[in-house]
Amino acid sequence: FDINIERIDELNLGHDRTLEVEDGLLNSVLDTDNGKSVGLHVCANKEAIKKCNIFIVTVPTPTDRHNRPVLTPMIKSSEIIGSVLKKGDIVIYESTVYPGVTEDEMVPILEKVSGMRFNQDFYCGYSPERINPGDKEHTVTKILKVTSGSTPEIAEVVDQLYKSIIIAGTHKAPSIKVAEAAKVIENSQRDINIAFINELSKIFNLMGIDTAEVLEAAGTKWNFLSFKPGLVGGHCIGVDPCLLYTSPSPRDKRQ
């Protein structure tokens, strides 16, 4: 489901403009008339998702010009899902967020719109998106997936769901907040380390030292994490550190 009708029409014609999925593979699983028992059905009609019992939200979480997280795509998605939510349904979020967004920000929206109670009538899970765009070797099924659920039973359901898809396996986190935090730091770590190497590269250049040779020498130690100078960008890595320093502190929540 997507609100972008142009995107839906394109996928139904068997083409993915991002080139993450080849046309042949897409066409082999596509269900354009919703007649298959198993297949990919893409639509922009909210009515078509009413019969679903598991909803997976994969929308972006950008930042504004003040580097504050913009949760609007997640909020709108939660409102749409809340309007069709049924007893026993599970809502799984994959968007990168600061710890607490799923349970403290999205759950109240689901409850308000659906009129149902969290962990009694419906449940939630969180499994951070792990993809490497443009990488044909480390595809989505070959990257280990972190999973979590709002109760131990739901955590197991979510974990088994992803295990049926992810060849590389899964890691079941003890809570949704742990899974949320894990995603933020894995991206932030890359941003920080690459930025650090970039600064060192500037210093070494002024000193007439070859950075590549320095990294090669340092890399002879078993626990040295090797990062090369380069660009840090994309829609996630450069943004995710902002999620950490803008997340509400425990003191803020008490007040």
Residue ranges and their predicted role:
Residues 245-252:
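Conserved small/polar residues in nucleotide/adenosyl-binding loops
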Residues 55, 244:
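Conserved, function-defining core regions and hallmark residues within catalytic/recognition domains
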Residues 56-57, 93:
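Redox-cofactor binding/interface segments in oxidoreductases and associated redox assembly factors
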Residues 63-130:
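Rossmann-like NAD(P)(H) cofactor-binding subdomain of soluble oxidoreductases
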Residues 237-241:
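A structural motif shared across PLP-dependent enzymes of the aminotransferase-like
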Residues 3-54, 61-67, 112-114:
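Conserved N-terminal Rossmann-fold NAD(P) cofactor-binding segment
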Residues 108-224:
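Internal alpha-helical scaffold of NAD(P)-dependent oxidoreductase catalytic cores
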